[in-house]
């Protein structure tokens, strides 16, 4: 598959855009380097690049494009918003409608505030938790990405009872020392950390189903124990549902799993392909936020009509009958086909799946936490990624990212993808 124009444009981008990309996750550094594919059009489950090549898309913009690209209902909502003005700086009727839709779907979010991204939503949840508890420290789980704010770009220290270390240049150790990182799905390590730091902890930050080192579901009882131990210490549970909300059911992963947090952060899917974030939770906690309380949060673009109306339209599509049943059916079909192809060609993989989201790890060890995910063979993944790209299947260029099925994918797309996987595995 020729991509000469992509290579030319990447050279031009390098001259004006830092690193040639506007997010490092779009770089091909982790999959052998070279020019990333430059896309110029998307429709339904498909991309077309600047060289005219078509791809089946499982990237879904890292999750938000759950209804497929340019879904007519979502597109019409965006066009109507553009016609009537995209930004007012005032309240609008649509933000009330949308907030009510979210609260009906995720009842733990008794009061809601919109902002501009998942990063902002998580960052503000932490601020609100600190304001409510009067404490400072945060506990998070290793490998879980919660945005690029200083508060959460922190890696584990030498053990679960030690303070964190910065996971990026430019983050002071003084900030990292307020964050404790423990392994996901390890309740003993979490209990150990809480026994040492619980009285100083404002909140525990949780992806209820991990979506940032593939797809990893919680072990039975893990989330319930996290809630119990956290609340016994007087701290709050914050769910980062930026990836998971409306991905697995019409609501949050918390609905699917039957465990409620105190605060929830949202993003990605709820914007219908436009920038958005939201956070919410128990009324008495949320009332810490201005103008009702002392915790400040604001945003010029927050609640803008374009993003809000796109989000309303997206949820209206997802609320239609059988949408999530079809995600399950197609997700299972795809996963089974990948496993069959791996067995056929003697390729060692682990495959994790929840509904229409899955992850393929080139390792012989089951992946229940970040340590196991790190052991997946990145060189083999890089070869697989390039082979799939040449087959016309677009995946995220990282061994840690998930595949996402959308409402636009068809049985024919799944069959095409399985055949492509079979050919790719034959060449590994």
Curated annotation (Swiss-Prot):
Entry-linked InterPro entries: 4pyrrol_synth_GluAld_NH2Trfase, Aminotrans_3, PyrdxlP-dep_Trfase, PyrdxlP-dep_Trfase_major, PyrdxlP-dep_Trfase_small
Subcellular localization: Cytoplasm
GO cellular component terms given for this protein: cytoplasm
GO terms, biological process: protoporphyrinogen IX biosynthetic process
Top-rank taxon, per record: Bacteria
E.C. number: 5.4.3.8
Catalytic activity: (S)-4-amino-5-oxopentanoate = 5-aminolevulinate
Modified residues (N6-(pyridoxal phosphate)lysine): 268
Known pathway: Porphyrin-containing compound metabolism; protoporphyrin-IX biosynthesis; 5-aminolevulinate from L-glutamyl-tRNA(Glu): step 2/2
Keyword Phosphoprotein on entry: no
Binding partners and assembly: Homodimer.
NCBIfam families: hemL (TIGR00713), PRK00062.1 (NF000818), PRK12389.1 (NF009055)
Protein name, per record: Glutamate-1-semialdehyde 2,1-aminomutase 1
Organism the protein comes from: Brevibacillus brevis (strain 47 / JCM 6285 / NBRC 100599)
Protein's gene: hemL1
């Amino acid at each position: 598959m020729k991509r000469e124009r992509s290579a030319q444009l990447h050279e031009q981008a390098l001259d004006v855009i830092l690193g040639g990309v506007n997010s490092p996750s779009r770089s091909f550094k982790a999959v052998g380097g070279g020019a990333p594919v430059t896309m110029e059009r998307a429709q339904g489950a498909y991309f077309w690049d600047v060289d005219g090549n078509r791809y089946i898309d499982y990237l879904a913009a890292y999750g938000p494009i759950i209804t497929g690209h340019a879904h007519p209902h979502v597109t019409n909502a965006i066009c109507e918003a553009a016609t009537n003005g995209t930004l007012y700086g005032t309240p609008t009727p649509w933000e009330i409608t949308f907030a009510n839709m979210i609260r009906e779907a995720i009842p733990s979010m008794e009061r809601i505030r919109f902002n501009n991204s998942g990063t902002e939503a998580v960052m503000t949840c932490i601020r609100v938790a600190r304001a409510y508890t009067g404490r400072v420290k945060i506990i998070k789980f290793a490998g879980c990405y919660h945005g690029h704010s200083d508060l959460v770009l922190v890696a584990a220290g030498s053990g679960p009872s030690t303070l964190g270390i910065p996971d990026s240049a430019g983050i002071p150790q003084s900030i990292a020392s307020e964050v404790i990182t423990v392994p996901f799905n390890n309740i003993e390590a979490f209990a150990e950390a809480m026994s040492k730091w619980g009285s100083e902890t404002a909140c525990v930050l949780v992806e209820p189903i991990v979506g940032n080192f593939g797809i990893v579901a919680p072990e039975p009882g893990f989330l319930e124990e996290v809630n119990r131990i956290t609340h016994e210490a007087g701290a709050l549970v914050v769910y980062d549902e930026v990836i998971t909300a409306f991905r697995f059911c019409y609501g949050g992963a918390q609905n699917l799993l039957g465990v409620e947090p105190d605060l929830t952060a949202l993003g990605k899917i709820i914007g219908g392909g436009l920038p958005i974030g939201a956070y919410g939770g128990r009324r008495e906690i949320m009332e810490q936020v201005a103008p009702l309380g002392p915790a400040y949060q604001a945003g010029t673009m927050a609640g803008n009509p374009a993003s809000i109306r796109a989000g309303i339209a997206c949820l209206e599509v997802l609320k239609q009958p059988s949408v999530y049943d079809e995600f399950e059916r197609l997700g299972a079909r795809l996963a089974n086909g990948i496993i069959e192809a791996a067995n056929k060609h003697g390729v060692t993989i682990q495959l994790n799946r929840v509904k229409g989201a899955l992850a393929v790890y080139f390792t012989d060890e089951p992946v229940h936490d970040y340590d196991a995910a790190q052991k997946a063979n990145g060189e083999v993944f890089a070869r697989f990624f390039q082979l799939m790209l040449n087959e016309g299947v677009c995946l995220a260029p990282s061994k840690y990212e998930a595949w996402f099925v959308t409402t636009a994918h068809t049985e024919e797309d799944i069959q095409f993808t399985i055949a492509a996987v079979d050919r790719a595995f034959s060449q590994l």
